[in-house]
Amino acid sequence: PIHDRGKYHIGDANVQKRVFQEFGDVDGIEENAIASHKENWLFAGVNHAATEPHAVVANWDPSGRLTLYTPQQVPHYVHRALADVLEIPMHQINVYRTFVGGGFGGKSDPFPHEMCSAILARKSGRPVRITFDREEVYWINRGRHPSRIEMNLHADEQGRICGIETDALIDGGGFASFGHVTTYYNGVLHTAPYEIGAFHYTGARVWTNKPASGAMRGHGAVNSRCAVETGLDDLAEQLSVDPIDLRLANLLPPHSATITGFRVTSIGMRECLERVKQESGWDKKFRKMPLGKGIGIGCGFFISGSGLPIHW
């Protein structure tokens, strides 16, 4: 089972990674706030379930070179893993990425069937193909982490987001996968597209006796993003401000940086929100629709580029 919040530690326990981040005047958050939202969230794990299942073909030529055909999203990871498992140099391995089809992060890891096909092909001297059925796809799950998130948001008298405090405990399953990065992403990927006065984040990923969790659709950002945007709606209600107007008032400008140091060059979120407000008929619908119907708004953010996007 997942450890209770506050009782996990690295050592003999089942904690793979723990993260602590603090930016801005964290001690002054509540002192400056006139509105606060505090909520605990419990998110279930989710599997990708792409139409195309995982598959691989492995073949060795007479000179001892391996050729692997696999619908991989990150073929370099497989290339490195094969070299380690087979104990041969990387230049003796060719990895060809075939048509991936649906991936969504679920075909990003080096998988057991890729290693097994290479080993079986070497032992048998013949090409080996492995294709998973749907149940087998679930057994090698690298889906979204089940997680427990405590999210606190605060706004000052000017309606500015003066602070966000987050604690995330995520269920990693039995293997590492992308878990080191996910532990960071649960925090740093909700520090935009808004200006934030202060940010405090603690996160931990724990091993459990389950299929591993990994990268899935908005890797590490979706659960905490949901908590942030819901919290902003609550702050808007407390401040008697329109939710779109609250977001517009707090947006990062172009050529700026998040509180954690991510560079923001171009940003079209303001134009997007203004267009959405106009085209959706927001002013005529918000808080005015019949029981059981409603209209809402939320913003997203994700990193882009080849640089290291986390604070190690």
Name every feature range the model reports, one short phrase each.
Residues 1-312:
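Structural alpha/beta core scaffold segments of enzyme domains
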